[in-house]
Amino acid sequence: MQVGNILINAISDGTFIARPTYFGDHAAAGHYDLFDRHGQAWLPIGCFLVRSGTRCVLVDAGMGPSRMWDGDDEPCRLVGGQLPVALRALGVHRDDVTDVVCTHLHPDHVGWLFDLDSRPNFPHATIWFGQGDWRYFIDRDDPLIQEHIHHGFRGHAGDAHLRPIDRDTSVAPGITAIQAPGHTPGHLCVVVASDGQRALLLGDAITCPVQLDEPAWHSMGDVDPGLADRTRERLWRELEGDDVTGTGAHFPELKFGRVLGGSGKRWWT
């Protein structure tokens, strides 16, 4: 995806398998554009490499070399591991990454930040994330976060390369992290803008395009469902613009799209 002078490469670190129960009590498996005949949605674990001038910005760091696979009947299962290979295929070495923006600190977005010895996987990168997520996940020792990731954050607390933010912040030329709370307290989205064009990288603020038609569908991980609803609606409206396109970390095939509206109906295209 080219946005003016900025190049965005979509990368899948692995697979996120969701059942209807992941989206709450209102979800049904009848959405055959999302669920297969076994009632499972096969979604990517998305990351995005954004190159702007001399800056090489990774948005989200995947699941890492780990998995969440407690049983076939669980609402969701995740397995990662592909990000390093994908970066190499794009000609990018881990030393080349100048910034990592974590839309939030769920395990499928931070998994490659630190190696299993809690050392930074991207040694020259500034890591940006929401201050509210630090308080919620790291200060509280949330068991959802992988142990080596916890230790990595805590061991480098106060380091200049860890940048918690609590307001909209410019990360690099044409790349801005904006506040989008609800899914998690400090959830961020990323706006890429160049030459009058914009792209929104939504993280998990919107899990999949079906939620445009099914506003009652939540994500199992929403910390504040009411606030997550309001944030989703704000982002849907933002995506109605002629100059903007967007995608989320779990959108099928990580395809970019926009919202078309008319006659009281909205479509994702």
What is each stretch, according to the model?
Residues 37-41, 178-183:
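Short Gly/Pro-enriched turn/cap motifs at secondary-structure boundaries
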Residues 2, 78-92, 96-108, 123-179, ...:
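Metallo-beta-lactamase
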Residues 110-120, 258-259:
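Metal-dependent catalytic neighborhoods of phosphoester/phosphodiester hydrolases
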Residues 13-14, 61-64, 105, 132-133, ...:
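Active-site metal-binding loops of divalent metal-dependent hydrolases
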Residues 76-81, 85, 195-269:
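Cap/insert and terminal regions of metallo-dependent hydrolase folds
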Residues 57-59, 101, 127, 199-201, ...:
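Residue-level marker for buried hydrophobic side chains located in beta-strands
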Residues 1-89, 189-208:
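Conserved beta-strand hairpin/beta-sheet module of binuclear metal-dependent hydrolase folds
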